[in-house]
């Protein structure tokens, strides 16, 4: 007759149970992940110890995990034929936190065995996840090699104590039975359990089997059942690249991404040395609908020694690469005790840095390819978020800058963004020292801007920046390959003014100074300065931002986002060769000068996409001036 003993949990275990049941894990289904993971550890231990002691296998050739449920008894069971535990090991490993047998086993391993151990139980807490869904847990185990009479049964309701009993157990290994809580019936379902296994344990190194109802020739259920494997038990990323086809890579991508299209590219690397991990990364062909939702969780799937730990491991990839899909499988990546949140440390930083480099290198390769179609597809889908990288990732700013694409005034460009900064530099004329750009709300607004008139006349290409992020982009990317990026709407375009001023007589210069002073006096409350410009050929006037001010386009965007912006006075630039400006110059009556000056200012502001404070006044003013010439 067996003897039953009652033991109290170690104090820390009591605390852990309360914490885990109520708060520690983010979803209750991970109990199965933890128990399958523990079973995998036990099989790993047996496999290695059997190398030096074949008797431990006890004649069983296949190492496997079995998952089942009993609707009537309301139980879920997880069975393995692994190494098992002695009575003392049960007390030490289950009754005591952070003292798991796996951790001690690792300490005793050396050489190549440690590399392939795939052991994940360093924290010794996974077993307690059982109590998230169960109000009683029964564990029956026998150490491989021990007599059948030396089995141990452990049982607890998770309320401060557990019982131990010596029992007979025919087979080595461990069987865990969870007596489910009243509200946990969802786990008494074949499809639900298989779904959890597929999500968390598909790539465990051992087969996971469940009893499946056999079907007859017509596909109908019969009374017979058979044990069927429900996981793949092969991790594609652990296989040599030479043994994998594009179809293999594409199928796995569709599995992890739930994307029906194939990816644009995959990046598969195995790193060995002081840091050991494997990465399999994918570049999607199409952006997800929530790509611009900054609150959405993103990131890679994290595995530790082929055991799934979490989706969306955001520490492993920066925000601007949030579209990258794939897995990181680490042999030594540290996790916190819940295994739900990555610890940010040197190892994480190294994996992240190397992964970012591989993605950027792959994109650079695509961007340089003779066939640009893949990179063009990528840019059309993800170009906006790549621009975030210039702002967020200073270390890789130069690499990212080479990947940027824009539309431009070059004859072959059009509205699609196909022009790189290097393309622009290669087409620069002799003596040109800057890369010129204009920001606008739309392509049509950019191409219609008066600021482009002089650049078109001189045959100087201008980049057309029409994405909302572009204003922030150029505030961080101020030069490329030694060439300054300069806005055509900036007041600081002295190189063109100085060139034109050399051709003027002293008399003309004085006349123009008199014109600007007259206009500035008339509307000094509306402008910071008035200048003669040489950037216009067809328009009478334009407005530019004063030196040190943000651009008008940026100010509009900030206001649209609810930011209170201080009132900025623009610089009004006049085209002295235009008929309307000549008319203004001829006027002596101050009220008339003011009306004409305001008309040219407001017209220029409208051309730049600004909203007038009093549009009705502009219409009245325009009608009055038109009436004068009829």
UniProtKB/Swiss-Prot annotation:
Tell me which Gene3D superfamilies the record gives: 3.30.230.80, 3.40.50.11260, Heat shock protein 90, C-terminal domain, Histidine kinase-like ATPase, C-terminal domain
Top-level taxon in the UniProt lineage: Bacteria
Per the UniProt record, which residue ranges are transmembrane? none
Major localisation? cytoplasm
Region annotation (B) maps to 340-556
Cross-referenced SUPFAM superfamilies: ATPase domain of HSP90 chaperone/DNA topoisomerase II/histidine kinase, HSP90 C-terminal domain, Ribosomal protein S5 domain 2-like
**Chain residue ranges for the region called A:** 1-339
| One Pfam family per UniProt | HATPase_c_3
Tell me the keywords, alphabetical order: ATP-binding, Chaperone, Cytoplasm, Nucleotide-binding, Stress response
List the subcellular locations: Cytoplasm
Chain residue ranges for the region called C: 557-630
Give a GO molecular function annotation for the protein: ATP binding
GO CC field: cytoplasm
Q: What does this protein do?
A: Molecular chaperone. Has ATPase activity.
Q: Which NCBIfam families match?
A: PRK05218.1
Q: Which family does it belong to?
A: Belongs to the heat shock protein 90 family.
HAMAP family linked: HSP90
- Quaternary state and partners of this protein? Homodimer.
Name of the featured protein: Chaperone protein HtpG
Q: Give the species.
A: Hydrogenovibrio crunogenus (strain DSM 25203 / XCL-2) (Thiomicrospira crunogena)
């Amino acid at each position: 007759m067996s003897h039953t003993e009652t033991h109290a949990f170690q104090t820390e275990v009591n605390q852990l149970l309360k914490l885990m049941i109520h708060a520690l894990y983010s979803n209750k289904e991970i109990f199965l992940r933890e128990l399958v993971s523990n079973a995998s550890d036990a099989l790993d231990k047996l496999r290695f110890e059997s190398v030096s002691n074949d008797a431990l296998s006890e004649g069983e050739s296949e190492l496997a995990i079995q998952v089942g449920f009993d609707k009537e008894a309301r139980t879920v069971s997880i069975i393995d034929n692994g190494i098992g535990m002695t009575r003392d090991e049960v007390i030490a490993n289950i009754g005591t936190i952070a003292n798991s047998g796996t951790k001690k086993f690792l300490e005793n391993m050396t050489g190549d065995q440690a590399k392939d151990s795939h052991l994940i139980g360093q924290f010794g807490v996974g077993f307690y996840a059982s109590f998230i869904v169960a109000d009683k847990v029964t564990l029956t185990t026998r150490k491989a090699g021990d007599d059948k009479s030396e089995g141990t049964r452990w049982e607890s309701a998770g309320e401060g104590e557990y019982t131990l009993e010596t029992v007979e157990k025919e087979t080595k290994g461990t069987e865990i039975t969870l007596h489910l809580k009243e509200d946990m019936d969802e786990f008494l379902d074949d499809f639900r359990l298989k779904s959890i296994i597929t999500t968390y344990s598909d790539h465990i190194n051992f087969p996971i089997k469940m009893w499946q109802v056999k079907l007859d020739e017509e596909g109908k259920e019969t009374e017979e059942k058979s044990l069927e494997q429900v996981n793949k038990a092969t991790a594609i990323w652990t296989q040599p690249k030479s043994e994998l086809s594009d179809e293999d890579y594409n199928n796995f991508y569709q599995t992890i991404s739930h994307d029906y299209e194939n990816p644009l590219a995959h990046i598969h690397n195995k790193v060995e040395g002081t840091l050991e991990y494997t990465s399999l990364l994918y570049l999607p062909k199409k952006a997800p609908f929530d790509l611009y939702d900054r609150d959405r969780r993103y990131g890679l799937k994290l595995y530790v020694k082929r055991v799934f730990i979490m989706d969306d491991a955001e520490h492993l990839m920066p925000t601007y690469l949030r579209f990258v899909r794939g897995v990181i499988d680490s042999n030594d990546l540290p996790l916190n005790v819940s295994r739900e949140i990555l610890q940010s440390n040197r190892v994480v930083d190294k994996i992240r840095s190397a992964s970012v480099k591989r993605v950027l290198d792959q994109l650079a390769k695509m961007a340089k390819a003779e066939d640009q179609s893949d990179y063009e597809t990528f840019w059309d889908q993800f170009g906006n978020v790549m621009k975030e990288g210039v702002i967020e990732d200073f270390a890789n700013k130069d690499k990212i800058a080479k990947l940027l694409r824009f539309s431009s005034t070059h004859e072959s460009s059009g509205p699609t963004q196909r022009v790189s900064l290097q393309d622009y530099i290669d087409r620069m004329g002799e003596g040109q020292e800057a890369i010129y750009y204009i920001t606008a709300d739309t392509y049509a607004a950019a191409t219609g801007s008066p600021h482009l008139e002089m650049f078109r006349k001189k045959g100087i290409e201008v980049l057309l920046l029409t994405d909302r992020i572009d204003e922030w982009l150029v505030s961080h990317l101020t030069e490329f390959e030694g060439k300054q990026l300069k806005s055509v709407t900036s007041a600081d375009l002295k190189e063109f003014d100085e060139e034109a001023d050399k051709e003027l007589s002293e008399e003309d210069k004085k006349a123009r100074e008199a014109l600007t002073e007259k206009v500035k006096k008339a509307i000094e409350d509306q402008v910071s300065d008035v200048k003669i410009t040489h950037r216009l050929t067809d328009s009478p006037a334009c407005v530019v931002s004063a030196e040190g001010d943000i651009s008008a386009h940026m100010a509009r965007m900030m206001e649209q986002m609810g930011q209170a912006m201080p009132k900025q006075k623009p610089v009004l630039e006049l085209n002295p060769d235009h008929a309307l400006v000549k008319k203004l110059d001829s006027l002596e009556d101050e009220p008339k000068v003011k009306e004409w000056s305001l008309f040219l200012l407001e017209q220029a502001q409208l051309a730049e996409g600004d909203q007038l404070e009093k549009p009705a006044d502009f219409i009245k003013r325009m009608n009055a001036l038109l009436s004068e010439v009829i």
